[in-house]
């Protein structure tokens, strides 16, 4: 299948080492670096998940003209991902998150980023999406709040996708869910749900009410709230469903939402019901949170759970 992936492209950097003493200059640990690892992050982690699940992925987003964007392009090529639909903006800085780690614990995260929104970039991205929409099977929006997923861009994307009866899946960010109106499915986590729903989220009924509120308020057909160790709550426009999580060891939740939305959209578009696709996505998420760092699922790993 062919998938359009729209979102904020991020380079993840992991600097690992040992801490054996405190700095004499300030009461902070000294990290003796032993390893550095650069991986595709943000929406590009969704691209990796989609590719590993057998999709051809059209990754659409913005990077700066800098060394970090060169690294992203090289990593994409190594992963078998197409790079030709990415806009290189001389006025932007490629988003990069550097995590400093000792004994599998994060000490600090350093972010380098600049909002990538401009009308010119918006027009370029819209043109790319329109040129690809007829050859795609589904669209996935991975919003990390860095500026790519603007209201106008998503309005045009959802409009032309709906005209072609192509499902749009949303992994949201922030409190402006209006820009996701008329999408097919949205997959907020608890924090993202609280950004738009100001009532308690404790019981299953609370989560059911939140799902229906999101669908009714923003004219979205289906909603899946990911609840961490408590699994998922699903509203499929008619019924509510709850899926339990059997996760045992959680080392890192980074990228779990990426894996959920990639697996869900892939299997649902293949023909699985939304509930069955969500169950498979839940299993995929349980696997990736047992690993450290931004790690995508692959088909062989997923098959071992099915």
Task: Show where each model-derived region lies.
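Conserved phosphate-binding/catalytic loop of the ribokinase/pfkB sugar-kinase fold
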Residues: 86-92, 99-135
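Structural motif
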Residues: 4-6, 109, 137-140, 169, ...
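Short acidic, glycine-rich surface-loop motifs adjacent to enzyme active sites
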Residues: 135-148
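Positively charged, low-complexity intrinsically disordered leader regions
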Residues: 1-20
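Active-site metal-binding loops of divalent metal-dependent hydrolases
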Residues: 8-9, 144, 259
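Conserved phosphate/ATP/ADP-binding segment of small-molecule kinases
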Residues: 146-240
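Conserved post-catalytic alpha-helical subdomain immediately downstream of the catalytic base
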Residues: 217-222, 246-305
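Substrate-binding N-lobe of the ribokinase-like
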Residues: 3, 24, 28-95, 305
């Amino acid at each position: 299948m062919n998938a359009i992936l729209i979102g904020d492209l991020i380079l993840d950097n992991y600097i690992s080492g040992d801490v054996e003493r405190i700095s004499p200059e300030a009461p902070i640990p000294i990290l003796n670096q032993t390893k550095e690892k650069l991986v595709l992050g943000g929406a590009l982690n969704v691209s990796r998940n989609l590719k590993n699940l057998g999709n051809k992925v059209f990754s659409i987003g913005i990077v700066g003209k800098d060394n970090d964007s060169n690294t992203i392009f090289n990593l994409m090529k190594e992963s078998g991902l197409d790079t030709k639909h990415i806009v290189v903006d001389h006025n932007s800085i490629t988003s990069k998150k550097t995590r400093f780690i000792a004994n599998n614990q994060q000490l600090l995260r350093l972010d380098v980023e600049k909002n990538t929104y401009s009308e010119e970039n918006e027009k370029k991205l819209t043109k790319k999406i329109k040129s690809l929409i007829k050859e795609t099977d589904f669209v996935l929006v991975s919003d990390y709040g860095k500026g790519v997923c603007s209201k106008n861009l998503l309005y045009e994307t959802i409009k032309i996708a709906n005209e072609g009866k192509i499902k749009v899946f949303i992994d949201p960010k922030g409190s402006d869910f209006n820009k996701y109106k008329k999408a097919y499915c949205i997959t907020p986590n608890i924090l993202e749900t609280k950004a738009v729903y100001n009532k308690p989220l404790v019981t299953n009924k609370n989560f059911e009410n939140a799902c229906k509120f999101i669908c009714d308020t923003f004219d979205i057909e289906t909603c899946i709230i990911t609840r961490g160790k408590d699994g998922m709550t699903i509203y499929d426009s008619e019924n509510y469903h709850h899926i339990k999580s059997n996760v045992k060891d959680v080392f890192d939740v980074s990228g779990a939402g990426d894996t959920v939305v990639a697996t869900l959209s892939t299997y649902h578009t293949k023909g699985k019901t939304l509930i069955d696709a969500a169950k498979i996505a839940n299993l995929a998420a349980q696997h990736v949170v047992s690993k450290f760092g931004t790690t995508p699922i692959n088909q062989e790993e997923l098959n071992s759970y099915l």
